[in-house]
């Protein structure tokens, strides 16, 4: 009887277990049927679906990039760091794809670190320029034509709007960041370059004497002669048409006689110039540096005297804003964009009729705090600037400008002045040729400017 009781209990448990199993299978079958009736969601897609109210990762990354660029005061004219964002192929949470171009590895790393703190990660295909260096890589260029156009976009980009950034001139050095391939029709390639003041742009390689690092070092080590004034006339020895070089341009010195100089042009031709038109670079650099260090006020007065000496010159002959040209004449390289030049230091109001100003101060004119033109203060209520009515350098009076609505309309309202500190060349935006990285042996990269 005891055996029969034990068996009966076991049978009961077996029957109960079977019933529970049947019920579980029925429930699972019902859930499977419901799932089949709903749209399927893959694990990858589910992982990439943002939380309710949260933007997709690529949109979050784009907004973070905009905030970062604003905080770092990135300027597309001088900062080569352009990024675009899209969905990540991995579909992982917080991931986005990033493409673009960068010549600022430190800034790019800083942005990636900021993104990581926000829970973002990237599948990066950013094109880093310049390319890894090799002995054969052409990393430098020297303008070999009288003047050439620097463009703001790659000319091979479809749908671009062609716009000239500025004119670059014979003998101007530039760093090559990226080169395009020669087209099938044998048209010249183009190069993305960085100019002496950091300005970026595209230029046809046919206008450049291309050099690798070794050749550029050799060029920098040669004795050179500097152009003392704008539009210096150079006569090639083979009877070719005259070429002209701008103030501050340095060319390889071949021979110096009392009545002439012979120099080597970037394209390999020899040319001669009048004896008073050029000067030995070493002597020029030393004289200007000694004056900057020993008497900054005397140096600024020399700027004013040179500006007044250019009165009557056509604006097109200058090739750059008047203050930039005058600074080059005295071995200072400054931004050629007026709005960047105007932010080299603290502004001076000038007070009424320039009572606060001193000879050599830079002056800026425009509308709504946006500089459009520039001049140099001469003293006694006068300044030198390109008169928009004649398109020539002229001596103008600040009091007349305020009373002459027509001239104010074209030149612009006086905004502020700026007094340089030529004895303190620590800002990469204001350098002598001796301290500029492109003139070093070996040459080096140009650091970011410090603007207010």
Residue ranges, per PLM feature:
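N-terminal secretory signal peptides that target proteins for export/translocation
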Residues: 1-12
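N-terminal targeting leaders
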Residues: 22-165, 205-214
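SH3/SH3-like beta-barrel superfamily modules
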Residues: 97-99, 164-204, 243-276
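Boundary regions of SH3-family modules and the immediately adjacent low-complexity/disordered segments
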Residues: 113-135, 194-228, 261-301, 305, ...
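Beta-loop motif signature
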Residues: 142-176, 180-183, 224-253
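Glycine-rich catalytic cores of cysteine/serine-nucleophile enzymes that process amide/ester linkages
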Residues: 168, 230-234, 240-261, 265-272, ...
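Aromatic- and glycine-rich peptidoglycan recognition patches
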Residues: 215-217, 223, 232, 236-240, ...
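Catalytic cysteine-centered active-site loop
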Residues: 312-358
């Amino acid at each position: 009887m005891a055996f029969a009781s034990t068996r009966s209990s076991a049978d009961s448990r077996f029957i109960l277990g079977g019933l529970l199993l049947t019920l579980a299978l029925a429930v699972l079958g019902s859930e499977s049927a419901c799932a089949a009736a709903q749209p399927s969601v893959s694990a990858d897609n589910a992982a990439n679906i943002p939380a309710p109210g949260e933007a997709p990762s690529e949109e979050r990354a784009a907004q973070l990039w905009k905030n970062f660029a604003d905080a770092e005061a990135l300027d597309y004219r001088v900062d080569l760091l352009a990024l675009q964002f899209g969905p990540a192929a991995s579909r992982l949470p917080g991931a986005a794809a990033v493409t673009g171009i960068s010549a600022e590895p430190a800034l790019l790393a800083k942005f990636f670190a900021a993104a990581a703190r926000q829970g973002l990660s990237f599948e990066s295909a950013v094109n880093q320029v310049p390319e890894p260096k090799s002995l054969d890589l052409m990393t430098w260029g020297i303008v070999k034509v009288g003047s050439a156009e620097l463009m703001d976009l790659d000319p091979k980009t479809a749908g671009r709007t062609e716009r000239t950034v500025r004119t670059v001139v014979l003998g101007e050095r530039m760093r090559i960041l990226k080169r395009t391939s020669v087209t099938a029709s044998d048209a010249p390639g183009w190069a993305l370059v960085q100019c002496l003041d950091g300005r970026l742009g595209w230029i046809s390689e046919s206008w450049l004497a291309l050099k690798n690092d070794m050749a550029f070092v050799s060029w920098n080590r040669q004795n050179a002669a500097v152009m003392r004034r704008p539009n210096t006339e150079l006569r090639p020895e083979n009877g070719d048409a005259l070429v002209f070089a701008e103030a501050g341009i340095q060319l390889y010195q071949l021979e110096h006689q009392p009545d002439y100089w012979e120099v080597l042009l970037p394209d390999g031709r020899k040319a001669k110039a009048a004896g008073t038109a050029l000067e030995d670079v070493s002597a020029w650099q030393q004289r200007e540096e000694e004056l900057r260090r020993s008497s900054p006020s005397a140096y600024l007065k020399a700027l004013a005297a040179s500006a007044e000496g250019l009165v009557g010159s056509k604006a097109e002959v200058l090739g750059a804003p008047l203050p930039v040209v005058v600074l080059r004449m005295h071995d200072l390289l400054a931004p050629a964009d007026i709005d960047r030049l105007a932010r080299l230091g603290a502004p001076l109001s000038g007070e009424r009729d320039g009572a606060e100003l001193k000879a050599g101060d830079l002056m800026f004119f425009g509308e709504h705090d946006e500089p459009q033109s520039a001049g140099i203060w001469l003293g006694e209520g006068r300044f030198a600037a390109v008169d928009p009515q004649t398109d020539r350098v002229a001596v103008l009076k600040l009091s007349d400008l305020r009373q002459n609505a027509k001239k104010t309309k074209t030149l612009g309202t006086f905004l502020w002045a700026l007094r340089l500190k030529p004895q303190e060349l620590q800002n990469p935006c204001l350098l002598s040729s001796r301290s500029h990285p492109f003139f070093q042996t070996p040459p080096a990269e140009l650091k970011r400017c410090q603007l207010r």
